[in-house]
């Protein structure tokens, strides 16, 4: 072993400090970011054992427990709602089921929430990039009722509105409309949380989604008709929310109708040389997933985790590699990233998992690694505080320990790749960046961590490379 574990930890500490300063100085260079398409209201409830047991007992424990073993993956009754929550606890897995029944929607509303936050990947990133990083940010809101608009923080966050025939950019609070409240009910539980004999192996959340607009990737008229004008105000775009698409809708439209519009937006972004990042999220429908993979060549960058990367390998036709990626083998992950780049020609792939991040790029530079380190700090700070208000708060995460298990992985990478230094691997026509992340022992909240990681890395890397 060339260096002791202590030496490596010291090295990463130094790299983290430098990366934070570099990102802090570079972020003001970013002149504008566009975020689309999913914004909603997150109603967060921290589950209480007694309350949950009482509700399960009232509705019928046997019926609810049956749902745990045979999940419908959608909610049309209260027992399905409670069964879904218990299944998520039992497996320690994040799950999201759509609420089809009005009766359950009323029940959810009456059950209430502990706090409201802006939700949806675009909405969460808007409060971070515009509110915390102070980057001028244009965000798509399918609906903009008062309850949602007030969840946007102050700062350079804008929604486009038509005044007569002119498109204006105003803060969401100045564009409130009598529109629908799109609520995602999020039930959070800590590691070890127990209800009856069901115990959570790790902290996570169950989402009951009562939102008909984002479920079909509804696009506002301003985005349908004024997209080119919006594009002129930005250098970067982050697209998310397409994972919910269904093959067919009751009104006769299909996922293709939505993706054709997305593709026309990407063509405009590319014409204006706007760099675009696609936040891939697990897409249940195979045909939709195939179509999303086909769209990747139009993007500059994609962000994903092991479940999403494996699901793409299945589409590409490498079942064996998909399995190995799910099992968490780092070399399989690297192979899969290379396969994805070969297949799509995409310039940048950002992989995030518990403990480490990787970025495979068709260009070189320490900025790629520094952006990953900054993203790790931002995620740790958000996990510690539950919410970020100022970019300076991210500095506090420097004191969070770096994941030592990932530092051991670094040794394996060194053995495999001769050209490996300070987390950077030269792969002839590509560069691979590896960073061990900061792990917060008991996070205040897990909502929006993935969005924080991807958007922080994408914008800070762009800012640093622009200097």
From Swiss-Prot:
Q: How does activity depend on temperature?
A: Optimum temperature may be above 100 degrees Celsius. Activity observed at 100 degrees Celsius is about 8 times that at 37 degrees Celsius. Thermostable up to 95 degrees Celsius. Retains full activity after heating at 90 degrees Celsius for 10 minutes and more than 95% of the full activity at 100 degrees Celsius for 10 min.
Cofactors: Mg(2+)
> Binding residues for Mg(2+), per the UniProt record?
279, 308, 451
Q: What is its EC number?
A: 2.7.1.-, 2.7.1.147
Q: Which residues form the ADPK domain?
A: 10-467
Q: Where in the cell is it found?
A: Cytoplasm
Is Kinase set as a keyword in this record? yes
Which residues carry out catalysis? 451 (proton acceptor)
Instruction: Report the HAMAP family cross-referenced here.
Output: ADP_glucokinase (MF_00809)
User: What is this protein identified as?
Assistant: ADP-dependent glucose/glucosamine kinase
Q: State the organism of origin.
A: Thermococcus litoralis (strain ATCC 51850 / DSM 5473 / JCM 8560 / NS-C)
């Amino acid at each position: 072993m060339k260096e002791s574990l202590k030496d490596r930890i010291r090295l990463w500490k130094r790299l983290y400090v430098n990366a934070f300063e570099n990102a802090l100085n570079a972020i003001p260079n970013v002149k504008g970011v566009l975020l689309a398409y999913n914004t909603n209201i997150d109603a967060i409830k921290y589950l209480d054992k007694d309350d949950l047991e009482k509700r399960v007992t009232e509705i019928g424990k046997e019926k609810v427990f049956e749902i745990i073993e045979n999940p419908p993956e959608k909610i049309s009754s209260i027992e399905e709602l409670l069964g879904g929550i218990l299944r998520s606890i039992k497996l320690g897995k994040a799950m999201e089921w759509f609420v089809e029944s009005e009766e359950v929607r009323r029940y959810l509303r009456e059950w209430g929430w502990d706090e409201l936050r802006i939700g949806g990947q675009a909405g969460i990133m808007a409060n971070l990039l515009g509110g915390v990083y102070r980057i001028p940010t244009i965000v798509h809101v399918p609906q903009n009722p008062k309850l949602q608009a007030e969840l946007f923080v102050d700062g350079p966050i804008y929604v486009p509105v038509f005044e007569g025939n002119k498109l204006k950019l105003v803060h969401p609070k100045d564009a409130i409309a009598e529109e629908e409240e799109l609520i995602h009910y999020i039930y959070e539980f800590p590691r070890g949380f127990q209800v009856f004999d069901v115990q959570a192996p790790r902290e996570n959340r169950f989402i009951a989604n009562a939102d008909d607009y984002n479920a079909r990737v509804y696009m506002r008229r301003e985005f349908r008709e004024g997209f080119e004008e919006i594009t002129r105000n930005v250098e970067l775009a982050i697209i998310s929310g397409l994972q919910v698409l269904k093959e067919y809708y009751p009104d006769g439209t299909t996922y293709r109708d939505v993706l054709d519009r997305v593709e026309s937006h990407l063509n405009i972004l590319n014409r204006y040389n706007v760099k675009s990042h696609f936040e891939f999220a697990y897409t249940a429908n195979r045909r939709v997933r195939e179509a999303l993979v086909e769209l990747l060549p139009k993007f500059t960058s994609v962000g994903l985790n092991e479940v999403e990367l494996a699901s793409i390998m299945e589409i590409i036709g490498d079942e064996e590699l998909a399995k190995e990626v799910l099992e968490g083998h780092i070399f399989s992950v690297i192979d899969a990233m290379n396969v994805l780049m070969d297949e799509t020609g995409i310039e940048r792939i950002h992989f995030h998992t518990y403990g480490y991040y990787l970025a495979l790029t068709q260009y070189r530079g320490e900025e790629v690694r520094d952006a990953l380190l900054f993203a790790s700090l931002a995620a740790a700070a958000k996990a510690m505080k539950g919410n970020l208000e100022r970019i300076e708060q991210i500095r506090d995460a420097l004191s969070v320990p770096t994941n030592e298990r990932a530092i051991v992985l670094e040794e394996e990478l060194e053995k495999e790749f001769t050209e490996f230094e300070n987390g950077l691997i030269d792969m002839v026509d590509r560069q691979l960046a590896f960073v061990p992340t900061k792990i917060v022992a008991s996070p205040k909240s897990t909502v929006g961590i993935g969005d924080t990681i991807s958007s922080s890395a994408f914008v800070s890397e762009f800012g640093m490379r622009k200097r």
